[in-house]
């Protein structure tokens, strides 16, 4: 079955979408404990821009409180806990390169 162009185009646009993020990548100082689940679903910007010089960038953010289970392997204890995760609320296509930086990827040295 062929997916219609307009559907493909709309789904690929720069927008917030549910994304799985690792708890340890988002909270790298928490490596002594085990978390369940080990990743959580949050809204993050992703998608394509109409111009390769642009990238899908968050222009609105908020902090989401998400309940997880923290387990301590040393004491064999566990508890429910609320952790904070950044969620994107709005996205825009913005220039890839900041003003003052060379346009384009840096040359390897």
From Swiss-Prot:
Residues bearing PTM Pyrrolidone carboxylic acid (Glu): 1
UniProt record, GO biological process: induction of positive chemotaxis; positive regulation of angiogenesis; positive regulation of endothelial cell proliferation; positive regulation of mast cell chemotaxis; response to hypoxia; sprouting angiogenesis; vascular endothelial growth factor receptor signaling pathway; vascular endothelial growth factor signaling pathway
GO molecular function, one term: growth factor activity
CDD domains: PDGF (cd00135)
Disulfide bonds: 14-56, 45-91, 49-93
GO cellular component: extracellular space; membrane
Compartments where found: Secreted
PROSITE patterns assigned: PDGF_1, PDGF_2
Primary role: Snake venom VEGFs may contribute to venom dispersion and prey subjugation by inducing vascular permeability and hypotension. This protein stimulates vascular endothelial cell proliferation (EC(50)=0.2 nM) in a similar manner than VR-1 and vammin. This angiogenesis probably occurs through VEGF receptor (KDR/VEGFR-2) signaling. Also induces drastic hypotension mediated by nitric oxide (NO), which is produced by VEGF-activated endothelium NO synthase. Also induces vascular permeability.
Family assignment from sequence similarity: Belongs to the PDGF/VEGF growth factor family. Snake venom VEGF subfamily.
Name the UniProt record assigns to this protein: Snake venom vascular endothelial growth factor toxin VR-1'
Organism for this UniProt entry: Daboia siamensis (Eastern Russel's viper)
């Amino acid at each position: 079955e062929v997916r219609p162009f307009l559907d493909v185009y709309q789904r690929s646009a720069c927008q917030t979408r549910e994304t799985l993020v690792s708890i340890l990548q988002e909270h790298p100082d928490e490596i002594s404990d085990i978390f369940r689940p080990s990743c959580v679903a949050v809204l993050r910007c992703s998608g394509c821009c109409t111009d390769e010089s642009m990238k899908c960038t968050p222009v609105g953010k908020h902090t989401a409180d998400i309940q997880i289970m923290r387990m301590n392997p040393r004491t064999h204890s566990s508890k429910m806990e609320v952790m904070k995760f950044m969620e994107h609320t709005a996205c825009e296509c913005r220039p890839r390169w900041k003003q003052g930086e060379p346009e384009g990827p840096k040359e390897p040295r």
